[in-house]
C-alpha cells in the first residue's frame, strides 16, 4: 500500500486501530467492570419491561442501554459494543462538523470512553448523547424545514433521550479492586487470588475473606481460619462487588442463609435500584437448597425472560418441580447437607 493510498484511507485506518485498541482494553484490562455492569441489571424480553421504560422521559435511552449491557455477559461482546459506539460517535461528530480536522472529530468518542470507566454512570448516558447527536445530524438544510423539525423534535428528543442531571456519588476506592477479586472468585482462580493478595494486601474485609478462602482451597491454611467472628460483619457488605464476593464465600462454606442475605444486599446496592440476573440465579440456588421450591420457581420464571440466563433456568426448573432430583445433584445435595448441620447466623 503506497503513501497516497494510506493517506486516502487515513480515517478508516484510525477507526480500525482505535476499535481494536478499545476491544483489547475492555477484554484484557477491564472485564470485571463489564461483568459488574451486566450483573447490575435484569433485561427482560417482554412487552411489560419495554412499557415500564418507555413511559418515563429518557426511558427509551435506558432501554437501549440496558439492551446492550446484557451482552456484557461475555466481556468480548462488551468490547465490541464500546468499539461500535466509539465509531458511531466519531462519524456523527464528523457529519455535524464537516470542517473540523479529522483528529478533533475523535474527541467526543474519547470523552464517552472515559465516562464508561465510571461504574455509577450507566450506558444510558452514552446512548442518550448519541441519540441527540443523530437528531442534530439529521437537521434539514432548508431554514423553514429546519425550524419545523426542531419544533417537532424537541419534545420527542426530551422523551426519548431524557433530561440531564448531575450529582456527585462518592465511589469507594476499593470498588474496582473488589470487582477484580469478584471476577477471580467466579472463575475459581484461587491461585490468582492468593498471589494478588500477597503482592498487594487489601483493606477490604470482603477481599480478605476471599483470600483466606482461596488459601483454604489451595491447602495453605486450615478450615478453622475461615470461621472467624468478623466473617459475619456487615463491613464486608459495603458495596455491590463486596456483597457478591461474600455471597460466593458464604455459598462455598455452606452458609446458605448468609449467602442469600449477601445476595439481597448486592441487589439492593445497585445504584439505580435495578434487579440483577446474576443475583436471581443465586437466589434460585439458595431456594433449592433451603427447600423453598415455590420461591425458586418464581425466580426461574423471571430468568426465563432473559437472553443469557434462559438456558440455565430451563435446565434447573426440573429440580424445583421435582425436588427428589436434587439428591442426585453433586453440588446442591452436599450444600443441603452442610446447611442442615450449620447453625444460622446474622450480620452484626
Predicted stretch roles:
Residues 145-166:
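Internal/C-terminal transmembrane anchor helices
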Residues 26-30, 93-97, 134-145, 161:
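Structural signal for the C-terminal ends of transmembrane alpha-helices
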Residues 36, 40, 54-58, 73, ...:
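Membrane-interface micro-motifs in multi-pass membrane enzymes
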Residues 54-72, 84-85:
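Short hydrophobic/aromatic helix or loop-helix immediately within or flanking a transmembrane segment
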Residues 170-336:
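Soluble catalytic regions of membrane-associated enzymes that act on cell-envelope
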Residues 83-99, 109, 134-136:
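Transmembrane-helix motifs of polytopic, lipid-linked glycan transferases
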Residues 1-22, 146-150:
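Start-transfer (signal-anchor) and selected internal transmembrane alpha helices
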Residues 25-43:
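Helix-to-loop transition at the C-terminal end of transmembrane segments
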Amino acid at each position: 500500500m503506497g503513501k497516497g493510498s494510506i493517506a486516502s484511507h487515513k480515517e478508516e485506518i484510525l477507526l480500525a486501530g482505535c476499535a481494536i485498541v478499545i476491544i483489547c482494553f475492555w477484554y484484557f484490562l477491564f472485564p470485571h467492570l463489564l461483568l459488574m455492569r451486566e450483573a447490575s441489571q435484569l433485561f427482560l424480553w417482554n412487552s411489560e419491561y419495554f412499557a415500564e421504560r418507555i413511559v418515563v422521559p429518557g426511558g427509551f435511552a435506558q432501554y437501549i442501554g440496558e439492551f446492550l449491557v446484557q451482552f456484557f455477559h461475555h466481556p468480548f461482546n462488551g468490547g465490541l459494543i464500546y468499539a461500535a459506539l466509539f465509531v458511531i460517535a466519531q462519524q456523527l461528530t464528523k457529519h455535524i462538523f464537516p470542517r473540523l480536522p479529522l483528529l478533533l472529530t475523535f474527541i467526543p468518542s474519547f470523552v464517552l470512553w472515559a465516562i464508561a470507566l465510571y461504574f455509577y454512570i450507566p450506558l444510558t448516558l452514552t446512548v442518550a448523547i448519541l441519540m441527540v447527536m443523530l437528531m442534530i445530524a439529521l437537521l434539514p438544510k432548508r431554514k423553514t424545514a429546519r425550524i419545523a423539525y426542531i419544533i417537532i423534535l424537541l419534545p420527542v428528543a426530551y422523551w426519548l433521550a431524557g433530561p440531564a442531571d448531575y450529582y456527585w456519588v462518592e465511589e469507594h476506592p476499593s470498588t474496582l479492586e473488589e470487582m477484580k477479586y469478584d471476577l477471580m472468585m467466579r472463575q475459581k482462580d484461587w491461585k490468582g487470588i492468593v498471589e494478588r493478595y500477597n503482592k498487594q494486601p487489601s483493606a477490604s474485609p470482603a477481599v480478605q475473606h476471599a483470600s483466606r478462602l482461596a488459601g483454604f482451597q489451595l491447602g495453605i491454611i486450615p478450615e478453622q481460619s475461615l470461621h472467624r467472628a468478623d466473617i459475619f460483619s456487615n463491613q464486608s457488605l459495603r458495596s455491590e462487588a463486596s456483597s457478591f464476593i461474600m455471597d460466593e464465600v458464604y455459598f462455598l462454606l455452606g452458609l446458605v442463609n448468609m449467602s442469600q442475605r449477601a445476595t439481597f444486599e448486592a441487589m439492593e446496592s445497585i445504584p439505580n435500584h435495578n434487579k440483577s440476573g446474576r443475583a436471581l440465579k443465586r437466589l434460585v440456588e439458595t431456594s433449592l437448597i433451603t427447600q423453598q421450591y415455590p420461591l425458586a420457581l418464581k425466580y426461574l420464571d423471571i430468568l426465563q425472560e432473559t437472553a443469557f440466563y434462559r438456558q440455565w433456568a430451563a435446565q434447573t426448573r426440573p429440580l424445583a418441580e421435582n425436588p427428589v432430583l436434587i439428591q442426585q445433584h453433586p453440588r446442591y445435595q452436599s450444600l443441603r447437607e452442610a446447611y442442615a448441620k450449620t447453625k444460622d447466623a446474622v450480620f452484626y
